[in-house]
Amino acid sequence: MNPLAKRIIPCLDIKEGRVVKGVNFLGLRDAGDPVEVARRYNEEGADEIAFLDITATHERRDTMCDIVRAVAKEVFIPLTVGGGIRKLEDMYTLLNAGCDKVSINSSAIKNPSLIDEGAKRFGSQCIVVAIDAKSRADKSGWNVYINGGRIDTGIDLLEWTKEVYERGAGEILLTSMDADGTKAGYDCEQLQTLSKLVDIPLIASGGAGTMEHIKEAFLSGADAALAATIFHYKEIDIMDLKRYLRSEGIEVRL
């Protein structure tokens, strides 16, 4: 794959082994089956798939590993899994089951050495650090939030981004909490700022509503665009999106 090609990544929330936020594909026998949904996205031209495990039980790991094994047998594009990864053993179990990358968020803030240890053990290319950021009230910048956006850490986004990079993260998945769910576009100022700060791939998340929004994210320095609703509800077809991006001079894999 062209390393300069921009990537389109549908994100699926998984709860107790099922896809939540219904996926509106015609002809799917079971829209809650992660394997079936992943297979369809693979056929439709997604470059990668991200799974976020939102199950709040300790049984989550076994269920998620079963899903990863089943998906990896059927789907040959990279698979990233996040949610509840707190230690190296969790990373090992998921990577061993067949996922390509693991995504850590709150656990990286609580134990930053997890980034170094994961990168050293499995390679930076396997470690994605997800960051949820929100504008400060005085608009002087952004703070990092954890626990699904419920807790303001008081940590500055730029400082944390630099630390994550220096500790060996291979990619950063940046969610703008201000833009998330608005369908009014990604936070392009945030993307521009971070893309100048570090030279690892930046995945934009939060705010996509149109093809133009995704183009703007790429022009603002994002290497990949992640979205859920617009793809799940077929508001945007991935191949149509890629043809549009290519017509606008943005390199994508068709």
UniProtKB/Swiss-Prot annotation:
Disulfide-bond pairs as recorded: none
Source organism (scientific name): Wolinella succinogenes (strain ATCC 29543 / DSM 1740 / CCUG 13145 / JCM 31913 / LMG 7466 / NCTC 11488 / FDC 602W)
EC number(s) stated in the UniProt entry for this protein: 4.3.2.10
SUPFAM superfamilies assigned to the protein according to its UniProt record, in alphabetical order: Ribulose-phoshate binding barrel (SSF51366)
Source species, domain of life: Bacteria
UniProt pathway annotation: Amino-acid biosynthesis; L-histidine biosynthesis; L-histidine from 5-phospho-alpha-D-ribose 1-diphosphate: step 5/9
Function description: IGPS catalyzes the conversion of PRFAR and glutamine to IGP, AICAR and glutamate. The HisF subunit catalyzes the cyclization activity that produces IGP and AICAR from PRFAR using the ammonia provided by the HisH subunit.
Record family assignment: Belongs to the HisA/HisF family.
Protein name, entry field: Imidazole glycerol phosphate synthase subunit HisF
CDD domains assigned to the protein according to its UniProt record, in alphabetical order: HisF
Signal peptide: none
Active site: 13, 132
PANTHER family on file: IMIDAZOLE GLYCEROL PHOSPHATE SYNTHASE HISHF (PTHR21235:SF2), IMIDAZOLE GLYCEROL PHOSPHATE SYNTHASE SUBUNIT HISF/H IGP SYNTHASE SUBUNIT HISF/H (PTHR21235)
Gene giving rise to this polypeptide: hisF
Main location, first listed in the record: cytoplasm
Gene Ontology cellular-component annotations: cytoplasm
